[in-house]
Amino acid sequence: MDNREALKTFMTGENFYLQHYLGAHREELNGEHGYTFRVWAPNAQAVHLVGDFTNWIENQIPMVRNDFGVWEVFTNMAQEGHIYKYHVTRQNGHQLMKIDPFAVRYEARPGTGAIVTELPEKKWKDGLWLARRKRWGFEERPVNIYEVHAGSWKRNSDGSPYSFAQLKDELIPYLVEMNYTHIEFMPLMSHPLGLSWGYQLMGYFALEHAYGRPEEFQDFVEECHTHNIGVIVDWVPGHFTINDDALAYYDGTPTFEYQDHNKAHNHGWGALNFDLGKNEVQSFLISCIKHWIDVYHLDGIRVDAVSNMLYLDYDDAPWTPNKDGGNLNYEGYYFLQRLNEVIKLEYPDVMMIAEESSSAIKITGMKEIGGLGFDYKWNMGWMNDILRFYEEDPIYRKYDFNLVTFSFMYVFKENYLLPFSHDEVVHGKKSMMHKMWGDRYNQFAGLRNLYTYQICHPGKKLLFMGSEYGQFLEWKSEEQLEWSNLEDPMNAKMKYFASQLNQFYKDHRCLWEIDTSYDGIEIIDADNRDQSVLSFIRKGKKGEMLVCIFNMVPVERKDFTIGLPVAGIYEEVWNTELEEWGGVWKEHNQTVQTQEGLWKDYEQTLTFTLPAMGASVWKIKRRLKSTKTVTNKNQKGVENEK
């Protein structure tokens, strides 16, 4: 694509490789080696290139505007590693230093200057991983995500975050030890304020300086792939930092943001919203995400704050209705459809995940049926209900038992991911451990029960760092995790439990093979509110099944009976109350044979001891012939709720 064609397609919103044209690029012009700098500022009066190579003199290197509003200059003064900015004379004559929106590196905070960088071509060694990803996809594969804030998983003795070179040496072995299938990073793009956690971005094409060089993150991803771990990154295409020297009103007029003040300003987050209907902004954002997938071989993208992009009244502030008088942001709706269409056409095996909390729009449905085309949607309703239930005193749980059963009424309305994310362990919400009811023993028991329920419930999984070993304090983004907690035997046992639970998930296909239809689950009993016990069966494609029973109160139930559709000899393969995990049971239940007898709509029964505040999972060891093997008729009732 020549320069003029690149500009034309930029203006029509069809240039998805914009970073190869705009920004700083090494070139040879008339036999002279140097760098060409280009920036889009259509309404600026003048733009000058300034940096280390001009001693920051503002008028030394003027740039020339073309017919498309892009300013350009070639210079042999700039060298690799030099810091630079653009000195923009805005439409009103006001002058301001601005970042290069297409830079691939920036200086360390509090500076915001771009660094002249030509990304080296990496010789990747993850071909086997990519081939498997392409062949297997992810819909019928285990997806169990460890969510990480790269700046606070661990820190150096001086308080600085680990670089990706350090994370490669320590975090990847930890992921392997803990048996996760994927890691998801909170935003890694350049951001001016650490306290934003990366959700108010400045440089969309650049790795945050504090995390090291781009090559270090490439090596990290490659090493993850070597160990069969996928890498997902959060991305924020809805809003950006309001800082004057970043994207905000770049040339003095709305450039990346909306013209309409109500649509442009996000009062709740103190940010600016992208004009998602503007062609140039669409080119910018889609180019950004393709850059991250191509340069870093990412396996998934989680799109943050989708509701903010879809609803004009999402912010608790004055808002402007759409042309039909409603609150749907048509620009955001059509942009998200187009984004997923473009990404899926080129990268069908890269996961697109939406963090979205409403239920009005089909998020994971295809464009043809009015959906947005995402692969997965965070199930925020399930998460809120289940946490509320587990925080409650067990005495009252029978009155709110619908909090754990309601999800079965809509479980396949979307393709869901079940998140216990960073948002649930900050701002006074308490850590996952601290949320649990009771004394310290019961809190650990409740957490083991909860995590087992998450693993057994249909949907992909996500857990925020520190939650796997029961950190008691809330997450603090400016400090490392409370690793000293592991000196306590209970926390150490909790960590071991989490690692074994993750392996249990990977080992049993029925827990992930059919995650999007009722073919993968059969409800045994969702009505036992008096005892607060829930039971269901997870099913695989080749007849594998696990019987999952959850006792959600601290009362052991001897001779507990449930009905089953298949006669046989069953063995307990999971019990959250084993002593090695912090419980009091020294061993599993004994193997049990089903008995013929009417139980609800079943004519086979299984009787065993159900541990207090425990989850018990059973697997058929040997099938037995029976003339009275039936399927739960109530299952059709659940299906009819779809």
Curated annotation (Swiss-Prot):
Active site: 304, 355
One Gene Ontology MF term: 1,4-alpha-glucan branching enzyme activity
Catalytic activity of the protein: Transfers a segment of a (1->4)-alpha-D-glucan chain to a primary hydroxy group in a similar glucan chain
One GO process term, biological-process aspect: glycogen biosynthetic process
Pfam families: Alpha-amylase, Alpha-amylase_C, CBM_48
Class in the EC hierarchy, top level: transferase
EC numbers, comma separated: 2.4.1.18
CDD domains given in the database record: AmyAc_Glg_BE, E_set_GBE_prok_N
Coiled coil, from the record: none
Pathway this chain belongs to: Glycan biosynthesis; glycogen biosynthesis
Domain of life: Bacteria
Presence of the UniProt keyword Glycosyltransferase in the record: yes
Keywords: Carbohydrate metabolism, Glycogen biosynthesis, Glycogen metabolism, Glycosyltransferase, Transferase
Keyword Glycosyltransferase: yes
Gene Ontology, cellular component aspect: cytosol
Family label: Belongs to the glycosyl hydrolase 13 family. GlgB subfamily.
Quaternary organization: Monomer.
Role summary: Catalyzes the formation of the alpha-1,6-glucosidic linkages in glycogen by scission of a 1,4-alpha-linked oligosaccharide from growing alpha-1,4-glucan chains and the subsequent attachment of the oligosaccharide to the alpha-1,6 position.
Alphabetical list of HAMAP family matching this protein: GlgB
Identification of the protein by name: 1,4-alpha-glucan branching enzyme GlgB
Species whose genome carries this gene: Streptococcus pneumoniae serotype 4 (strain ATCC BAA-334 / TIGR4)
Upper lineage: Bacteria, Bacillati, Bacillota, Bacilli, Lactobacillales
Gene it is expressed from: glgB
